């Protein structure tokens, strides 16, 4: 990883300054994933003439079976090519940021104007992928060089394996351009309690994104089964088609904010030492999703000098991002449980409950952008206290309650709930058009016999569309304690402790989700969400820092509470997997030179996660919840920073 910045400032005189910033970031990561496997949505047919087909017409035909003389074709839709090796993933990220502006003072007004351009590029390359076309060619050869899918992983020659291995690449690029101007006046006019300030500003933004997929993924090079003649959009084994996508938009915004005192201490009003207000509004116009105006109001009351009571109300707005609006298709491989087939097992007495059902084979989870999305809206209010006791210097306690109601949330239903809805609708004589199934085979018909249910084929694709979902309410409590101990014989100390509790997180249940709940099925991201899927009830962090002359040190601790992972269910109890709490500590020591060649240079030696705590196990890609935990382990670092006047 490389991260570098350059900051420039130049004083023009007359209270005017030019400033600039140049930033560059580059990172490269490598990882491995399991060997490539076929999807039921893109099977491979082994021809009856293939050399290693045990049911074919060639020399390796099995004896003693009632097989036609011309042999049989064999379809494989759940085969993992172990001898091709694990997929090797290389990701390179680069980004840069250019900023130039000017700021100054004109009379009672402070002003600032700048232009910004930033761009980022990600190149995601995966080696040891498999071309379906080349794989089928290798399988259907009519000599011993053919690829054998019916033997141990070591039976095929490396030349044969290499004949169908490919590299697959995806490139993603984003760009942001911005020009703004803002100005403020702390003394716009005076009230009896003091001066009222005003800030105004305007901004223009340009956003752009492009996703360019490999030709074998975006439909340029497709896979046509040479036996059945069926054409599939993707030629990459284990991946559905991914069309290229792009989008851009312009945003014009303006804001105004006014703040000032209504009551001051020298007015000597009982129980109102101070009373301050803030009112603000912001307007935004998007060229793709419309415009909006949102207000904000804040009131701060000091009954006495040491106690502040503050309250606020604000409305918010979030436009769908460009990928949610414009992405044609994104695809992932998932393993949903097919409860319709499970119901057949229950009806026949093969299993007793849904908890005994197993997941399906690999199913393509297709996600589609939606240009008709509406912006999200939110309404939030808060009430807080700040107490600074007069009998202890530099000690502060804070407590803030907050409540947010969000409407028209942009999201996508989980692949499991989409599959569950197919189960519900089939029980009632219909089906879910967003669940694509293969034609029922003779094996499927035999499986459903005696269950009282109509036979169906395996799930092939589950399609999810970004949509505006129902409302969500969230509330919580933030607590803080801060203490500074200055000018002791041992130096200066600072202590900070923060804790956050989620009181409520409730996603409204829509009509489709209510249907599933009535059947006793688990709903993802619906209902009470406290302690569910990355939402621990409690989180906390604490910092202790010390400095003495040129020396300094710090200790940091972080606590993340336990929560349940709804993606994993314990077989013996049927309960969700409990992700344990996690506590880590980090420490550093530093020295700052204040004279000589290295003046204003700081050297820091630190250890992150000093106790080498591993993240708790979760049902995620790498085995842990990346939004809350990390697998970095104990990390020792040495940093050098220099300031130039």
Model regions and ranges:
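Surface-exposed, low-complexity loop segments enriched in small/polar and acidic residues
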Residues: 1, 5-7, 11, 15-251, ...
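Residues that define the transmembrane beta-barrel architecture of outer-membrane proteins
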Residues: 2, 92-96, 175-177, 248-254, ...
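Residues on the lipid-exposed face of transmembrane beta-strands in outer-membrane beta-barrel proteins
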Residues: 6-10, 100-104, 181-185, 254-260, ...
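Short loop/turn motifs that connect adjacent beta-strands in outer-membrane beta-barrel proteins
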Residues: 12-16, 105-111, 188-196, 263-275, ...
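Transmembrane beta-strands of outer-membrane beta-barrel proteins
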Residues: 18-20, 111-113, 196-202, 273-279, ...
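Transmembrane beta-strands of outer-membrane beta-barrel pores
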Residues: 24-28, 106-108, 115-123, 187, ...
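C-terminal beta-barrel architecture of Gram-negative outer-membrane proteins
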Residues: 332, 491, 495-596
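C-terminal beta-signal and adjacent terminal beta-strands/loops
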Residues: 396, 405-408, 503-506, 556-568, ...
